[in-house]
Design a protein with these regions (language model features):
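Glycan-association/targeting regions that enable binding to alpha-glucans and other polysaccharides
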Residues: 1-167, 171-185, 197, 201, ...
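Membrane-helix boundary/interface segments in integral membrane proteins
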Residues: 209-221
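C-terminal TM-helix exit segments that contain a strictly Trp-centered aromatic cap at the helix terminus
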Residues: 200-212, 276-286
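Residue-level detector of functional hotspots within protein domains
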Residues: 143, 189, 193, 207, ...
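N-terminal low-hydrophobic presequence detector
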Residues: 154-156, 160, 191, 231, ...
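Generic detector of multi-pass transmembrane helix bundles and their immediately adjacent loops
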Residues: 219-224, 228-286
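A loop-to-helix transmembrane entry motif
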Residues: 190-200, 223-231
Length: 286
């Protein structure tokens, strides 16, 4: 039975972290707009890892090659009311319908918003990509990130994986306790390991990953509002509180020192699982 719990916890951990990774990755978006026989298309650039300019490519198909059109890239640094910089896109050598321009390299942690604009020979704007630019339909976004070496990101992911594995064991053990089985000692051990591994993966290594990626030390609650760091804070806060409630069993074998009865602790374990599940299903800021 114990082996089955471990195998099931492992499988569910793989599934959960796979889903979490999938919803956190910003996939390049193919966008296209057609107007009066003119077709403009572009696959967005979502991130730039490491130093270097960001090359923006677009495809422009026009019905009458003799007509004169001007395709421009507009970009600005950071969100807000700042002015866009305009760069005329140049034909890509060896092609008839490919155009390119670059967004200059920026420090890690910076963001650039951009869109494409096509004008006729009189300078009149014909179309833009994205087609509608307003508060509800933002321009394309590219994030500038630093490189995170494998020897940093590897242990970080492994520790967070292990912490979720123990959270699933907390869930299974909590359910056993509600069904009448005396699994308090197991619950305390699993919750202790979940807390320790979450701390190691989320604080020293999590802070290092954030610093290498965005150039920040800590961007989350209670100081800032970064989603990923704030999730780590909330998760650690809950599991530390849970350890305090179950301290008699977690740090010894004195059940009398626990601050809540067994079934209440089981419900706290289930709530911890639900919180962990919800937090991991919130996309990372990275």
């Amino acid at each position: 039975m114990k082996l089955f719990k471990y195998v099931l916890a492992f499988v569910l951990t793989v599934i959960l972290l796979g889903i979490a990774r999938h919803i956190s990755i910003r996939v390049p978006e193919f966008a296209e707009v057609i107007s009066d026989g003119i077709k403009l298309s572009h696959t967005s650039v979502t991130e730039k890892i490491g130093a270097g300019d960001v090359k923006i490519l677009a495809t422009l198909v026009i019905p009458s090659p003799e007509e004169n059109y001007s395709l421009s890239l507009f970009y600005k640094i950071g969100k807000g009311e700042g002015q866009y910089t305009s760069v005329k896109m140049q034909p890509v050598e060896g092609t008839n319908d490919q155009f390119s321009a670059v967004i200059p390299s920026l420090p890690k942690g910076k963001r650039a918003y951009y869109y494409l604009s096509l004008s006729d020979s009189q300078g009149k704007k014909i179309l833009t990509l994205p087609e509608k630019l307003d508060l509800l339909n933002n321009p394309f976004l590219v994030k500038f990130k630093g490189k995170v070496p494998p020897y940093v990101i590897g242990p970080h992911v492994l520790l967070m994986f292990a912490s979720v594995f123990f959270v699933f064991l907390v869930l299974f053990t909590s359910l056993e306790m509600l069904w009448g089985k005396d699994s308090l000692r197991q619950l305390s051990v699993y919750s202790l390991w979940a807390t320790i591994l979450s701390f190691l993966g989320g604080v020293p290594l999590g802070i290092l990953v954030t610093n290498l990626t965005f150039g920040e030390i800590w961007g989350g609650f209670p100081i800032f509002t970064d989603i990923t760091d704030s999730k780590t804070s909330i998760l650690l806060f809950y599991w530390i509180i849970f350890l305090i409630l179950i301290k008699g069993s977690a740090f010894g074998k004195d059940k009398a020192k626990n601050l809540l009865p067994d079934k209440a602790l089981a419900w706290f374990g289930i709530l911890g699982y639900i919180l962990t599940l919800g937090i991991y299903l919130i996309p990372h800021s990275i």
